[in-house]
Amino acid sequence: HIMRRRQRQMCIRDSWNIQGVTCSVRVLKDLQEKLRRGNWGITVLLYYKENTVPEIVDIHSGYSEIPAFGVAIDLGSTSIAATLCDLNSGKIVGSMGIMNPQIRYGEDVMSRVSYCMMEEKGLATLNNSVIQGINELTRKIAEKHGIKLDSIFEIVFVANPIMHHLLLGIDPKELGQAPFPLALSDSLTIKSKDIGIILNPESYVYTVPCIGGHVGADAASVLIAEQPQKLKDTTTLLIDIGTNAEILLAKGEEIFACSCPTGPALEGAQISAGQRAAPGAIERVRIDPITKEPRFKVIGCEQWSNEKEFSENVSGVGVTGICGSGIIEAVAEMRLAGLLDANGLIGSSAQTGSNRCTSSERTNSYLLYSDNKVSLSITNMDIRACLLYTSDAADDA
């Protein structure tokens, strides 16, 4: 065994100047057969993390590019969004999302903390629920793009602290009371199989570190992406909108962070035509201030709704609802077009001069889109849900 290990290390060292490698018994079992099949030539896939020994996670016969994919997951309280990436090219293959199955046990994170405290097997139930949801999501996105789960070697998570703890099976009850201590605030790299995620058996999970309190890895990722500290003489306010809003105020290299519960209004819940951000969801809205006619963009279609090619190109995904960014723009555009008064109430057809404004049961609504399958309107209750959301975020800011 020692001689074989030395030979393996010498081959990789001499060919690629990589010092020292390791691999699991599962990978080692296939080595001899794949060497012979490849005429004594093989291609290995190495997983390498700084300050660790490189690990062989896959072997192919001969000399070829090993299909290698990774998944980035935003684990939200209401929805789970996944982006599939080709690790060889760095290109994004596709995205997909599902509702977080934990929502049946509580709409927000604090209700899930309460569930863990009140139910004997509450933590295990919530952990199993989210792991099953992640496995379903990765299976669906892999199937959609014709990729084997065995070709996915890394999965990266960002989440708020409570979702982070529930993912790892860590009791979050201490996060339900001051001073909100985290069990783990650093990054973590573990085998996917150790927490029940079904990918390649040698694949790894990497969790982005949380900042602290209720400001999580999702907010940390926003800072990494936007890098507001580079804008030396500018004050920047960043808001990560979700069931919890995380707010970051940056001035030079000083960055202040806080979070507040705001509810799931912008993630598909509490909005009459609301849905998560997925193909078919209206994500952009513009309303002509003179004609009061809307135009919009749908996730999965490049054209605006007033362009000629829209009807043909949108047929594959359809128009199914409106997501968070869409409802924000719709409310703003309705106000600019004179469809809303200062209190956020939708005017009647006579008041606005638009037949799209209709009255029903002593309340008004604005028709955004309709066809023979679906009718999507913005109602006064939708406006109120958005106002409650933004007031919570504004108070925190």
Residue ranges of each PLM-predicted region?
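Single conserved hydrophobic/aromatic residue that forms the stacking wall/gate
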Residues: 1-8, 12-14, 389-397
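N-terminal glycine/serine-rich phosphate-binding loop of ATP-dependent small-molecule kinases
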Residues: 5-9, 13-168, 173-177, 206, ...
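Glycine-rich phosphate-binding loop of actin/hexokinase-like ATP-binding domains
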Residues: 73-77, 82-108, 173-189, 221, ...
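Gly-rich Lys/Arg/Thr-decorated short loops/hinges at beta-loop-alpha junctions or inter-strand turns
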Residues: 108-123, 199-206, 370-385
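Hydrophobic alpha-helical scaffolding
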Residues: 120-128, 209-215, 237, 269-272, ...
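Active-site neighborhood for divalent-cation/phosphate handling
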Residues: 184-226
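P-loop NTPase catalytic cores that bind/hydrolyze ATP
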Residues: 320-338
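A contiguous, well-structured pocket-lining segment that forms one wall/lid of small-molecule binding clefts
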Residues: 335-391
